[in-house]
From Swiss-Prot:
It is a single-pass membrane protein. This is Anti-sigma-I factor RsgI9. SUPFAM superfamilies: Trypsin-like serine proteases. It comes from the Bacteria. Residues 353-367 have a biased composition (Pro residues). The lineage of its organism: Bacteria, Bacillati, Bacillota, Clostridia, Eubacteriales. Residues 345-392 are annotated as: Disordered. One of its GO terms (molecular function) is serine-type endopeptidase activity.
């Protein structure tokens, strides 16, 4: 009967192996053995040790004999190993042969001769590097290198690697004390609470000087948000910041949606916070208070703090700017909240600050005729929006030739999504990320009816719903000229072109309704309607420049949202440094060809990890590779991290009727969760047919860390 385990140490001509049932056995070392390797061996290969002396035994003390089954007498307490970065930092290592103290002349290094470093890996914390150092020590545990066949169970998807890298204790370090959300309260004092998922205050910050006075003497840590809110407002009232007249209280909140669990239920979590805030305001029982609650995102919160503003004041600043008001950060800092809100609602100037007025020019006596044009070198006023010419039908038709149909298919050739896109370079097309994220195969149909296979995504941003696609071959579709959001103002006229009716272009004319959309970091609202099918298409200004990309469904308010083209322009500028053939794919899509069924097995298992689908993950492997422990590890992985698994390449190396080999490269990047180093996996797997279905039965991989 074969015994299976992982090599935990190599000493001279012996390999120390930790078996599946947690025994430690020594076998004869072979040349190809290395630490971390999974091996199988017969029971008669286990090395029998006779009368070994141990340096950790007191003078004259010995472990007389170690039998073939390596049960070392009284060797039962190697535990509580913390911060495993030093050889001698092992606690409770006191029960070797009932020894109470070590020999005086024993070395300081915690080493048992010929059997050093017996480690229960389930109790190791902060475990992040295995080194092939000749010394018997584990140091700076941030790399796993030269590990072949690291996991029988999850080598292809690196699930075991992740568990091994960080240890269960680190991965589960997601306590209720983590920063769950930020809530600011503005009367004139600006106070910010950092709360955990139980709505308990863990940090209180004074954003301005008035807030320091309010917080003085208040013990708010561990208070629930409702109570903390009441205490702050009552203190503000006692100091005269809340009077008998009408009082405005502005409450702003930002959810820390870097936390995966929080982001997945964002709307629900925001509603819970709003309810808690409402309860706090009601508990004051003060009819003079008029309160307003607003939501910002983390990026806006960071910008607010950079400008020494509360989230609420920064929100009002952005709102004023959107309405075209001439207002500065300093004015927002120094103004009363009530004045700010009322001025913005009335859309009047914040303060009677004098503005430069051009001197009056006497009216010319003779009225100039049309032929008396102003000299070109004379200063002239800018043309009003009405003076900007419309795009003509012929111009729109020419621009529309660069708009394409984007179609995503599943493995059964069924259309899963369809929308618009447009050319931004030779064989490069911009579109919405949501259109292609679930596509196994993606095709682009040009205006002339030609269909091109997409090789993959070269750039993408999930939050902004943008993706840049590269076709397998260069196309003849003319790229459009990209403009900028900076050229737009409220009321600017636009033209949107999409593929609402499949291959036929649809043209919609409208104007810029707003340069900001609630809940989105950077978006534009149009007066023109955007259909689901035309999403991903270009939005043009009256000069024919693409100033935005339509994004149907990105806003929860059902507004016609557009993402500024500036982001795509930055990508195109970066990629223009490379030839078409050297533009790297970061997220591969497949092609319906003779290799599809083999490539799809690798594609499917990696997508199962990203979709947190353990059933599909194991379904891609042979039954022999399944293990309950791996399933449990995956559950920990899925609940702790939000990882992006991006396939860069898949190629069939060899194939026959019953077996095949597929090479692949994919990356794992953290999007949310505890500390994690991103890395690239380069591997090759073997496939066999099981009841007519191709499954993975073996793989070999190399791993490298990436930025």
């Amino acid at each position: 009967m074969k015994i299976t385990g992982v090599i935990v140490r190599i000493h001279k001509d012996r390999a120390i192996i930790r078996t599946d049932d947690n025994r430690l056995l020594a076998v004869k070392r072979h040349n190809d053995m290395m630490v971390g390797q999974i091996v199988s061996f017969d029971a008669n290969e286990v090395h029998k040790v006779e009368s070994k002396k141990y340096k950790y035994a007191a003078s004259g003390k010995r472990i007389e004999k170690v039998q073939k089954t390596p049960k070392i007498k009284n060797f039962s307490r190697i535990n509580n190993i913390k911060e495993f970065s030093r050889v001698d930092d092992i606690k409770n290592f006191s029960r070797v042969a009932a020894t109470k103290e070590t020999s005086q002349d024993s070395p300081q290094e915690s080493k048992v001769e010929n059997f050093s470093r017996v480690v229960d890996f389930s109790r190791v914390m902060n475990f992040s590097r295995v080194s092939n150092s000749k010394k018997n020590e584990i140091k700076n545990f941030s790399r796993i290198s030269n590990i072949k066949n690291f996991s029988r169970i999850a080598s292809i998807a690196a699930a075991f690697v992740l568990i091994f890298l960080f240890g269960r204790n680190v991965m589960l370090n997601n306590s209720s004390d983590s920063e769950y959300a930020y809530v600011s309260v503005d009367v004139n004092p600006s106070v910010e609470f950092t709360i955990n998922s139980k709505h308990k205050v863990i940090v209180t910050s004074a954003i301005n000087q008035d807030a320091s006075e309010v917080l003085d003497g208040l013990e708010l840590k561990e208070k629930d948000l409702k109570s903390a809110l009441v205490m702050v407002l009552e203190k503000a009232e006692s100091l005269g910041y809340i009077s008998d007249d009408k009082n405005y209280v502005l409450v702003s909140m930002a959810l820390n949606d870097k936390n995966k669990k929080t982001r997945d239920k964002r709307e629900e979590k925001i509603d819970e916070l709003k309810e808690t805030i409402e309860q706090g305001i009601e508990a004051l029982d003060n009819d003079t208070i008029v309160h307003r609650t607003v939501t910002v995102d983390l990026e806006e919160r960071n910008k607010a703090l950079e400008n020494e503003l509360s989230m609420g004041r920064y929100y009002l600043y952005l709102e004023a700017k959107e309405k075209g008001m001439d207002i500065t950060i300093d004015e927002v800092k120094s103004s009363k909240i009530s004045d700010l809100i009322e001025k913005i609602e009335d859309n009047t100037e914040l303060a009677p600050t004098p503005t430069p007025v051009p001197p009056e020019t006497p009216e010319p006596t003779p009225t100039p005729t049309a032929s008396e044009a102003t000299p070109s070198n004379s200063p002239v006023e800018s043309k009003s929006p009405e003076a900007v010419p419309e795009l003509g039908s012929r111009e729109i038709e020419i621009l529309g030739e660069s708009v394409v149909l984007v179609t995503a298919y599943d493995e059964n050739r069924k259309v899963v999504s369809q929308g618009s896109g447009f050319a931004v370079g030779t064989g490069l097309f911009a579109t919405n990320y949501h259109l292609v994220k679930d596509g196994v195969v993606v095709k682009i149909t040009a205006g002339d009816g030609k269909v091109y296979d997409v090789d993959g995504i070269v750039k993408y941003d999930k939050a902004k719903d943008l993706a840049l696609l590269k076709t397998r071959v260069e196309t003849g579709v003319n790229p459009l000229k990209l403009g900028t959001k900076k050229s737009l103002t409220k009321g600017s006229r636009i033209v949107a072109i999409g593929k609402a009716n499949g291959a036929k272009n649809t043209v919609t004319k409208g104007s810029i309704k707003s340069l900001k959309v609630d809940g989105l970091t950077d978006a534009i609202e149009l007066s023109a309607s955007i259909s689901k099918e035309s999403t991903g298409g270009p939005v043009f200004d009256m000069k024919g420049n693409v100033v935005g990309i339509t994004a149907y469904g990105i806003s929860k308010q059902n507004v016609n949202a557009v993402i500024p083209a500036d982001y795509v322009a930055d990508w195109v500028k970066e990629l223009s440094k490379h030839s078409f053939g050297n533009i790297r794919i970061v997220r591969k899509t497949l092609v319906f060809d003779s290799d599809f069924e083999f490539n799809f097995v690798v594609y499917k298992i990696i997508r199962a990890l990203e979709n947190e689908d353990a059933a599909t993950y194991f379904g891609c492997m042979t039954d022999e590779l399944y293990k309950d422990e791996t399933r449990k590890n995956l559950e920990v992985l899925f609940t702790t991290y939000d990882l992006a698994y991006n396939i860069e390449s898949i190629n069939v190396v060899s194939k026959s009727e019953e077996q095949a080999k597929v090479s692949y490269v994919y990356t794992i990047n953290k999007e949310a969760g505890p500390n994690f180093k991103n890395y690239r996996i380069i591997g090759e797997c073997s496939l066999i047919k099981v009841d007519g279905t191709w499954k993975i039965n073996d793989s070999e991989e190399k791993k490298e860390y990436i930025q």
